[in-house]
């Protein structure tokens, strides 16, 4: 199962300019997690659903976090061009 601690840690470490919304529900041993990243104006930056079985979600969280951090670095150094990523 995806722990609430894992979700909260993921959200805390995401780039600060992303406003995250999400939710999780459980169906047997399958967890479904939907996370969306939004800019201050509410526009969607990225959106992803994680589906996992048998507690393998940690690797997917880490992969998504790496992509978010990469997006943050690119957008911080960009010349005003909007960056979008599929996480």
From Swiss-Prot:
Domain of life according to the entry: Eukaryota
Taxonomic placement: Eukaryota, Fungi, Dikarya, Ascomycota, Saccharomycotina
Descriptive protein name: Uncharacterized protein YMR106W-A
